[in-house]
């Protein structure tokens, strides 16, 4: 347990940031899951909007330092490939 006042405060701050980061990750995973579901259903109209939403959430996570930029780039690239495959099919 922390003894210094600043260390006690940092424990609270870290807990708060962890909660916020979990919310951001959850929102991102949900948007990716929705995009994959739309791709599986073959809905070409909504797939572009869902991709933009997922890409936006991934970029926001990178900007806030929640996930690494290479991880986001890899996920966006793979999702984009799936979207393009659906659009050309």
From Swiss-Prot:
Keywords, alphabetical: Ribonucleoprotein, Ribosomal protein, RNA-binding, rRNA-binding
SUPFAM superfamilies from the UniProt entry: Ribosomal protein S20
GO cellular component: cytosol; small ribosomal subunit
Keyword set includes Zinc-finger: no
One Pfam family from the record: Ribosomal_S20p
TM stretches of this protein: none
One example of a Gene Ontology biological process annotation: translation
Signal peptide: none
MF GO annotations: small ribosomal subunit rRNA binding; structural constituent of ribosome
NCBIfam families: S20 (TIGR00029)
Record family assignment: Belongs to the bacterial ribosomal protein bS20 family.
Cited HAMAP family: Ribosomal_bS20
Stated role: Binds directly to 16S ribosomal RNA.
Name used for this protein in its record: Small ribosomal subunit protein bS20
Source species taxonomy: Bacteria, Pseudomonadati, Pseudomonadota, Alphaproteobacteria, Rickettsiales
């Amino acid at each position: 347990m922390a003894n210094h006042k600043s260390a006690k405060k940092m424990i609270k701050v870290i807990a708060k940031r962890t909660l916020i980061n979990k919310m951001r990750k959850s929102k991102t995973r949900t948007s990716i899951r929705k995009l994959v579901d739309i791709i599986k259903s073959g809905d070409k109209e909504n797939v572009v909007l869902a991709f933009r939403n997922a890409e936006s959430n991934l970029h926001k996570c990178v900007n806030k330092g929640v996930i690494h930029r290479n991880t986001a780039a890899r996920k966006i690239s793979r999702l984009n490939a799936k979207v393009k495959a659906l659009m050309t099919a």
